[in-house]
Amino acid sequence: MKKIFLFLSLVSVLGITSLFAISYDDNEYSRKSRAYTQLAEKAYDAGEYDTAIEYSQLAENFAQESAEYIKRMMARNEAEDAMNKARTRYAWAKQQKADKNYPTEYLIAGEAIKAGGIAFDNKNYDVAVTCAEKALESLKTVEPEDKVIAKAAADKAAAEKAAKEKAAREKSAKDKAAKEKAAKEKAAKDKAAKEKAAKEKAAKDKAAKEKAAKEKAAREMAAKEKAAKDKAAKEEAARKAAEEAAARKAAEEAAARKAAEEEAARIAAEEEAARKAAEEEAARKAAEEALYNEKGEKVLPSEYKVLTWKLDRECFWNIAKNPAVYNDPFMWRKLYEANKDKIPESNNPDWVEAETILVIPSIRGERREGLYDPDVKYQALPKR
């Protein structure tokens, strides 16, 4: 039984000593462990089993102390390597001015290295490794100073570009608002001018009718006064000539009545002729205004979709020349002024993009609606 125990003890000692044989093996404890192992083997061979057991236990104790020593030294080396890496990274970060560019990360790393150094001095190697790892983790985002400067310059350029683009958008919005305001003001002025013209025309028509009525009443009054004067003169002449001849008086009275009837008939004929002429003029104007609708043709378009220049030679001149537009190429400027905010360059009427929808303003009060259809026959706008 003692032989078996002694054998197992020797195997255990040899196992412990071989576990850390790679490094730090030649230390005070390992040397004593090996010495007692040899003594145990000799005592065992000599049959001194109790002595061999005692030596083997001493060898095992020193082997355990050697293993703990090796473990401490390995932990110390690991902590030392970790702290050296952290200090090296910290020194590099300082050269890159991390204290200015990454103040928070730099401060955290410095405090961690300081704490790690204290832990290392107190042989708390695990704590030292943790502190070193914390410092390295804090400094991992630190970049070289030239890269930081380049990034700052790029960020500044991007911010300036964004500011310029924002200013351009704001200016474009203001310009658009100004154009829309000007267009609304122009439309309001045009509407007011049309309303004023309509009122003036109505006033003129009313004045003309009143003048015609007054002239008619004056003519009727003059005719009545003349008839009365003629009648009085004839009656006076008849009274004076009563003695001369009753027959002549009767003839004169008949002639006076006939003259009065003829005058009344003439005035009535003139009034009837004036009335018919006014009715015919009104009918003629109504017929002219209804020409665009009563012939079964579509109302003139209010919009025009631009085709291509290369194939269709589309431009303001040719579009204005279209019978359904203005039937007059010289009206191209009217079309341009109404649509210059839709072309790439508002001050360049020669550049009109295909697919652009142009507005066709009315130039004579003609009715317009819908998009121009090249397959529909329109009543051409009469030329002046």
Curated annotation (Swiss-Prot):
Q: Which UniProt keywords apply?
A: Cell outer membrane, Membrane, Repeat, Signal
Identify the main location. Answer: membrane
The answer to whether UniProt assigns keyword Membrane to this entry is yes
According to its UniProt record, where is this protein located?
Answer: Cell outer membrane
Extract the signal peptide range. Answer: 1-21
Q: Please, which domain of life does this record's source organism belong to?
A: Bacteria
Q: Where is this region: 17 X 5 AA tandem repeats of K-A-A-[AKR]-[ED]?
A: 151-235
Protein family according to the UniProt entry = To T.pallidum TmpB.
- Indicate what this protein is called per its UniProt record: Treponemal membrane protein B
What is the organism of origin for this protein?
A: Treponema phagedenis
